[in-house]
Amino acid sequence: MNENLFASFIAPTILGLPAAVLIILLPPLLIPTSKYLINNRLIATQQWLIQLTSKQMMTMHNAKGRTWSLMLMWLIIFIATTNLLGLLPHSFTPTTQLSMNLAMAIPLWAGAVTTGFRSKTKNALAHLLPQGTPTPLIPMLVIIETISLFIQPMALAVRLTANITAGHLLMHLIGSATLAMSTTNLPSTLIIFTVLILLTMLEIAVALIQAYVFTLLVSLYLHENT
């Protein structure tokens, strides 16, 4: 039986109730924590990665911007873990849903913009009008800059959705081709299976990179407004 190409992107249900909530709550449970003074290698590596990422993102921020550090670290860990779990066979990836990505992008973007308008109102308004703009073009440029400002959360969500969805579709197509040719052409099957393994490794990197890019862009929006 041929499976629908987009079947893996349909949110699963349990007894008619959406299971996406349980899937979203799963990543925090997989992050190991330690109650001991001496940590094992896994927790030590995890703490090192968190400190390295935090240093990369928060160096450019002032004291007000650094108050967001905990939220940004939670965001990158959540997205990365969710993306990696979605690479498991017969699993569901919440970040392929535009609605969920918008639910993450809009509040974070709105919080950063609101912070800018509250603390630096003049500077925030100055972003809507580039310096040296000719007087006849001022109304048009203000409208364009305002539209581009409101497009930012949509661009964040669409970028994450498109990259994760494209990778899953490509893996699904190559996996289906491998299965279909396994009984007819063994040499070609081995070649395609090797390509599938390489693509899976690439998708693991993409899952981590997209989590970093999403969080980094939120951090840049915050930096512009603090």
Curated annotation (Swiss-Prot):
Disulphide bond pairs: none
Sorted UniProt keywords: ATP synthesis, CF(0), Hydrogen ion transport, Ion transport, Membrane, Mitochondrion, Mitochondrion inner membrane, Transmembrane, Transmembrane helix, Transport
Localization per record: Mitochondrion inner membrane
Catalyzed chemical reaction(s): H(+)(in) = H(+)(out)
InterPro entries: ATP_synth_F0_asu (IPR000568), ATP_synth_F0_asu_AS (IPR023011), ATP_synth_F0_asu_bact/mt (IPR045083), F0_ATP_A_sf (IPR035908)
Any single GO BP term: proton transmembrane transport
Chief localization: mitochondrion
Keyword Cytoplasm: no
PROSITE patterns on file: ATPASE_A
One of the record's GO cellular component terms: mitochondrial inner membrane
GO molecular function: proton channel activity
Sequence intervals crossing the membrane: 5-25, 68-88, 97-117, 138-158, 160-180, 189-209
Membrane topology summary: Multi-pass membrane protein
Keyword Lyase: no
PANTHER family given in the database record: ATP SYNTHASE SUBUNIT A (PTHR11410:SF0)
Function in brief: Subunit a, of the mitochondrial membrane ATP synthase complex (F(1)F(0) ATP synthase or Complex V) that produces ATP from ADP in the presence of a proton gradient across the membrane which is generated by electron transport complexes of the respiratory chain. ATP synthase complex consist of a soluble F(1) head domain - the catalytic core - and a membrane F(1) domain - the membrane proton channel. These two domains are linked by a central stalk rotating inside the F(1) region and a stationary peripheral stalk.
UniProt similarity note: Belongs to the ATPase A chain family.
Subunit structure: Component of the ATP synthase complex composed at least of ATP5F1A/subunit alpha, ATP5F1B/subunit beta, ATP5MC1/subunit c (homooctomer), MT-ATP6/subunit a, MT-ATP8/subunit 8, ATP5ME/subunit e, ATP5MF/subunit f, ATP5MG/subunit g, ATP5MK/subunit k, ATP5MJ/subunit j, ATP5F1C/subunit gamma, ATP5F1D/subunit delta, ATP5F1E/subunit epsilon, ATP5PF/subunit F6, ATP5PB/subunit b, ATP5PD/subunit d, ATP5PO/subunit OSCP.
NCBIfam families registered for this protein in UniProt: ATP_synt_6_or_A
Protein name: ATP synthase F(0) complex subunit a
Organism: Gorilla gorilla gorilla (Western lowland gorilla)
Lineage: Eukaryota, Metazoa, Chordata, Craniata, Vertebrata
